[in-house]
Design a protein with these regions (language model features):
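Membrane-proximal intracellular helices of multi-pass ion channels
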Residues: 1-230
């Protein structure tokens, strides 16, 4: 929830820069989600921080469900998508990096919502559990059980002995590739806003775009398509 809330505030910043009229709604969204996350953290601070494998599976399932439901709040408060079922579908599609959408005209959406939409792709692409493994030790909570629940295969004691460091390196690579692609797309002719959104979507192997025609909007510029393919 704290991760979601932080990125909602980042979306609010983009909204303020582009003056799309929904900055306040995004700030409220981030505040609600962040306070809820802090409250849950406070209520559980005295509980046993070591979790077994069964609890690890439960945390993985509930983690995804909570992330998706909290991710619907910006859509609900801004009123950019009608109907909770449509909002839930769009949010789930984002976090699962599916790329399916119920929005007929994405170009009329405010920049803050388009950015939040791409953020859900980006977070879901690497996997929130991998991100959690990287930061849970900072809170004094073990992450190996989450890794066991999220990743089928050999037992974790046969894998990298420092799984937290591995998760951090994965995210460093993920962020680096996103930044590099954003820069390349800008050099190829995209605006910064379009470049960062398409980079997050592409790195996550998703399909969300800021244009109705997606990359077809830049058919006259094959360099953009080459960058995305590479």
């Amino acid at each position: 929830l704290l991760i979601n809330g932080g990125f909602m505030f980042l979306s609010a910043l983009l909204s303020y820069i582009y003056k799309d009229g929904i900055t306040g709604d995004l700030i409220i969204s981030g505040t609600i989600v962040s306070i809820t996350g802090l409250l849950m953290l406070f209520l559980n601070k005295n509980h046993d921080k070591q979790i077994n494998k069964r609890e690890g599976y439960l945390v993985v399932v509930l983690g995804w469900v909570i992330m998706i439901f909290s991710g619907t709040i910006p859509y609900l408060l801004t009123g950019t998508i009608e109907g909770f079922s449509n909002i839930f579908f769009e949010t789930t599609s984002g976090y699962t990096a599916t790329g399916a959408t119920i929005i007929n005209d994405v170009e009329i959406l405010p920049e803050g919502i388009l950015f939040w939409r791409s953020i859900t792709h980006w977070l879901g692409g690497m996997g929130m559990i991998v991100f959690a493994i990287a930061i849970l030790p900072l809170l004094g909570i073990g992450g190996m059980q989450l890794f066991s629940a999220e990743s089928p295969g050999p037992s974790t004691d046969k894998l990298h002995p420092r799984i937290t460091d591995t998760a951090k390196r994965l995210w460093l690579i993920y962020v680096s590739y996103t930044v590099i692609e954003t820069i390349f797309l800008q050099f190829a002719g995209m605006s910064f806003f379009d470049a960062i959104n398409h980079s997050m979507s592409n790195i996550a192997s998703g399909g969300f775009s800021t244009k109705n025609a997606s990359l077809g909007h830049w058919n006259s510029n094959p360099m953009i398509q080459y960058i995305v393919i590479i």
